[in-house]
Structure formats: C-alpha cells, structure tokens
Amino acid sequence: FYNCAIGVMRGAEAIDEYIGLPRQEAFDIEYWALEEAKLQRMPKEKEFARKVVVVAGAGSGIGRETAIRFVREGAHVVCADLNEEAAQATADEISAKIGKGIGVAGTGVSSCGNVIGVKIDITDSESIQAAYDKAVYAFGGIDSVILTAGIFMAPNVDGEFSVKQWELVFKINSIGPYLVADAAKKIFMAQGKHMKSSVVITTSVNAVVAKKGSVAYDSSKAASNHIVRELAVELAPYARVNAVAPATVVKGSLMFPRERVMASLKKYSIAYSEDESTEELRNKLAGFYAGRTLTNSPITPEDQAEAIFFMAGDRSSKTTGLVFNVDGGLHEAFLR
C-alpha cells in the first residue's frame, strides 16, 4: 500500500502538483461504507421507540394492559390514575420486568427509566396539567395521550338515578376526555405539526345500545363518541383523535366489583353461588357476554390495548375522528 501511494504521488508530481484528499473525504471513503453496513444489520427500531405516552387510567384493567403494551414496543410511559398507588404499582410492575434507566437529572425523577407513575384527576384541569408537567420534565415531551378512565353507576332500588349521579358520570365519562385532550393540545402545538401526535379515548359500544339500568352511563358514552369527533377537528393538524369502543370488559375492571357482578348474574338469570370466588363469578358473566357476540369471544383488556396501540401509531396515520369498535361482533351495536 505504501509503495502504491508513493507511486501515485510521484506520478502526480511529474505532471503538476500532488494534492492529498481532505481528511474528511478520506475518512468517508475508508470508514463510512463499513459503518453503514453495521447500521443496516441492526434490528429494526420498535414502533414506539423514543416516544412518550401518557396513559390515564393505568392503575387497572384496560389502562394497565395498555401501558404494558406500549412499553413492550419501546415507549416511555407515564402511568396516570386517580389512585396514585395503583398507577405506581403498574409502573413498578413494568420496571421490575425491564429495569430502570438513568432518567433526567434535576427533575426529581432521575431514576425513572422508561416508566413513571403519577396521579391524575381527569375532571380537574390543574391535576391534568400537573401530570403533563411531570411527563414533560421526565421525558421531554408527549407524543400520545391515552384515556381509559371511566365510571359506571347503578340506579337506586327504584331504578332511578339522582342528579348527582348524572353529574358525576358525565363529568368523568364526557367532560373528562375533553379536558384531557384540550390540555394536551397546548403541548402538541408547542411541539409542532411534524410530531404526528395522537389521542385515543376509550368509549363504549353501549353508546349506541339502549337498555334498562344504565341510562346515565350509556348516554355519557354517546356524548363521548361525538366529543371524539369534535376533538379531531379541534386538534387538527397537530394531533389525531380517535376512540376505541369495547363491549363489556369484565376481566380486571374496577367497574365490576363483586356486588355488581352478582347483580348482573341475577339480572340475566345465570345460576351462581355466593360461595364462588369473585374471579369465578366474573368468568361466568364474561362467558354470558361472549355468548351475545358473533365471535362468541370474551372481550379482554388485552384486546382493547392492541386496538389502542394501533390507533395511536403511525399505521393509522390517515385516520382521525373514528370510533373503532372492539366488541367481538355485538350486532346490537351495529349502526343503522
């Protein structure tokens, strides 16, 4: 190699003057092709790598499974819940599996790793902003907001709902989603249109299915369906807004305590014993609901998490204002 280089230099000097390559160009020739080959052999980056996702309702059920799903695909996740201990429990469960990173120094969450737990009250603008502030301080911004929090209230013994019940159900199920998305809008606008942000809200197929005993809940979900469409208009072009509408999810849901499960079994004339465990009773009820669907399948939190993950990501980048049913084929919820 040395002799060849000397020969080239002598040949150049015989004609005119030898001028060596700039050091950067020589480096590019010698090393860049090798580095490029190394990059091409690296595994493909996960779909939500380097993205930050806030999951409101992450303390249980659909929200918990959604947080786990996003972390599995590389996201940094803020587990938020009205029950701060439940939110932190989900965060701790995830951290135990994936480990902790170094976080961001000086933020108070310097050992946060990929996930943190925070408190959020989706009916309180200050609480929502505080949760978002912690997300931004920990991870630098927010790419997606997922809202799975909700409430079901049963009527009294006479089948009536009080005004206070109506107000609380609508405050959580309808006004809450608006407040959460509206507060996120300010962050999305500051980050810019190029960030391709998204919001996914859990509504319900009960929004279009009329039945006795749940008029407040069903009406609030009908309102939230249209709020999603309005938010899609309001947040464009900074973020897409969509909804995932599940059929009844019994597994892991705080909306199905033992008392409600037993009341539902009695309502549908399903035989049960009070000696059975809560899990056994829930499985019976889930089996009944599954039998009403075209696929005869129980609807699980994992099913909803998968749909939410899809709606939040780039694979649905051309979709906004959509209410996406994940109900096993509940024909009563077919729109007409």
Regions flagged by a language model, labelled:
Residues 158, 209-215, 296, 314:
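Active-site loop immediately N-terminal to the catalytic Tyr-X3-Lys motif
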Residues 204:
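Residue(s) in the substrate-gating loop at a strand-loop-helix junction
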Residues 152-155, 308-309, 320-336:
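Short C-terminal tail/terminal secondary-structure segment
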Residues 156-158, 162-167, 289:
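Substrate-binding pocket helix/loop in short-chain dehydrogenase/reductase
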